[in-house]
């Protein structure tokens, strides 16, 4: 359980550091600007960040990638219609288990709220799912949808693992 918290905190830290990267002033040499003014954008490889975080769980809590667009659309209706730079989703091998990780980098800041709403709808619907009542506490009490710049992350922890207050406050 502690490994899961560490995984989520590591993923959130990577995203927060990426959001801190901003525009840099154009480099100057001999008092003149070189080239066009470019914005240096920092980005996070969400797939690698998620895989690194999931690796810390070991065999205790396996999560597998969801890569099929139709499956993504079935789980998160409307998500595939949003223009994204990156999207990774991980689920356990057993349906209904209260443990998921979704990380999205949207192409436009205007889409952040749309993605946040889609992921929050997933949390809300699973929290009220009568098909898997044993997992309801995880969705009600141990889930978070966070936004940091153009990144939106949804994490759900198994029952018995609580989100640290610092984690909730940061995201």
Predicted regions span which residues?
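N-terminal, intrinsically disordered, polar/charged segments of Gram-positive cell-envelope systems
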Residues: 6, 21-74
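Extracytoplasmic/secreted envelope proteins and their assembly/folding machinery
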Residues: 47-54, 112, 116-120, 164, ...
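C-terminal motif of bacterial Sec signal peptides marking the signal peptidase cleavage site
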Residues: 15-19
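Short, compositionally biased low-complexity segments enriched in polar/charged residues
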Residues: 63-98, 110-111
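Short Gly/Thr-rich strand-loop-strand
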Residues: 109-149
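Positively charged n-region of N-terminal signal peptides that target proteins for export
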Residues: 1-4
